[in-house]
Amino acid sequence: MSLVEELKTRNFSIYGQWIGVLCIILCIALGIANIFHASLVIIFSIICIVQGLVVVFVEIPFLLRICPVTERFSNFIRFFNQNWPRAAFYIGMATIQYCSLIFMTTSLLVPAVFLTITSMCYALAALKHQEFTGSSTLGGAGIARQIL
């Protein structure tokens, strides 16, 4: 199934996965950009970089197969193979980034907003009783089944 066909299915978990990929880029890039602040924002930028790296494994499942990770980390990532856990995971990460606003308003607000949008996509998929579906472009369909 091509990317366009996947997007036409109106499955919000696929939308969430693609916005999650955008979150990877935003978290890593803006985490690095904000690491040069001379305030407690540095802590949140480091957390944002780590969040981006964790989301890489959550959203691109075949990386668990090719990257050497511990069994504990692998089980942690596999826990998020349903819509509700992913929605909670993303809203939790967004909340952490929203807390950075306490110290200073920075561009870390952008990952927080996109993490919230991703969470809403997964929550909508769960509320509409849509089965969690990974994008085949990102290694979802056949490859994800072999891993799990």
From Swiss-Prot:
Keywords: Glycoprotein, Golgi apparatus, Membrane, Transmembrane, Transmembrane helix. It is a multi-pass membrane protein. One of its GO terms (biological process) is vesicle-mediated transport. Its main location: Golgi. One of its GO terms (cellular component) is Golgi membrane. The chain crosses the membrane at residues 18-38, 40-60, 84-104, 107-127. It is found in: Golgi apparatus membrane. InterPro entries: TVP18/Ca-channel_flower (IPR019365). Glycans are attached at residue 11. Belongs to the TVP18 family. Golgi membrane protein involved in vesicular trafficking. This is Golgi apparatus membrane protein TVP18. It comes from Yarrowia lipolytica (strain CLIB 122 / E 150) (Yeast).
